[in-house]
């Protein structure tokens, strides 16, 4: 009888343990854990702005300063966690890169982003990285046909300008130019196309930086940078991370800040600019 009771008690305890165990829920894995499990991290890049990001016209490989910083992020994560993490590049246009981050389609994006107030409201701005040295004298201004004088913001009245949507240059134009007295800004998908629109009188000016203009002017001698300069002080670039991914954002910030100890932006930019030129790719920044 005692054996029977003991057997029944054992069965009851066993059933109870199974029932309790079945009710437990596993803690969802963090994005970082998922990256470590997959062995790669995804980055959205628009490869149309050499030397920051461009494609080898023969192999199709995406290259550039931003690519090198993204690679360093993957390397940093690998070394920090002791697991191999590779970089997987997702190519798309500039606007789509930001949308991909917002929807969680990619882990992060690098495209020479500035930490604007709007971006800080909608994304984690990880970084900074690629901090420009004091000796670098590039500026943001307007690429125009020779003969068109633009010296002040007021000179833009009545002119049709172009800029990449959601870019720093677009925001500078919206903030510092008399937009209410100008035609609607022409949204440019790529800077090379914007330069063509200036050359063919589709727009009066392309809002860009002087570094981008150097190569464009070299290949299009009828163009020049206007005397006007936007007021802007660079504090480096940032990577965009989904606003809800605070842990991942902190990790990418950690990696990008650390990159400053092992990567010199000015040297890297010159190397990538030379590589782009050798490949016949127009250097735009």
Which residue ranges define each predicted feature?
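Acidic, polar ligand-binding/catalytic clefts
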Residues: 83-155
């Amino acid at each position: 009888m005692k054996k029977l009771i003991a057997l029944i008690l054992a069965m009851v305890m066993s059933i109870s343990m199974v029932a309790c165990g079945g009710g437990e829920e596993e803690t969802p894995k963090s994005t970082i854990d998922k990256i470590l499990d997959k062995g790669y991290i995804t980055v959205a890049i628009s490869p149309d702005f050499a030397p920051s990001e461009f494609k080898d016209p023969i192999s199709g490989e995406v290259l550039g300063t931003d690519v090198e910083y993204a690679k360093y992020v993957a390397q940093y994560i690998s070394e920090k966690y002791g697991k191999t993490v590779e970089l997987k590049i997702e190519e798309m246009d500039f606007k789509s890169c930001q949308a991909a981050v917002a929807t969680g389609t990619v882990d992060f994006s690098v495209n020479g982003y500035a930490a604007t107030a709007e971006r800080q409201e909608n994304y984690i701005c990880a970084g900074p990285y690629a901090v420009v040295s004091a000796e670098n004298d590039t500026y943001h201004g307007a690429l125009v046909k020779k003969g068109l004088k633009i010296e002040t913001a007021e000179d833009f009245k009545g002119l049709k300008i172009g800029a990449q949507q959601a870019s720093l240059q677009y925001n500078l134009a919206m903030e510092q130019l008399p937009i209410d007295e100008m035609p609607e800004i022409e949204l440019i998908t790529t800077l090379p196309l914007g330069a063509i629109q200036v050359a063919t009188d589709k727009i009066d000016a392309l809002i860009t930086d002087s570094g981008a203009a150097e190569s464009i002017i070299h290949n299009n001698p009828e163009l020049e940078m206007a005397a006007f300069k936007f007021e802007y002080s660079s504090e480096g670039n940032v990577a965009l991370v989904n606003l809800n991914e605070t842990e991942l954002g902190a990790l990418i910030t950690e990696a990008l800040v650390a990159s400053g100890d092992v990567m010199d932006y000015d040297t890297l930019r010159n190397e990538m600019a030379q590589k782009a030129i050798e490949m016949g790719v127009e250097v735009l920044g």
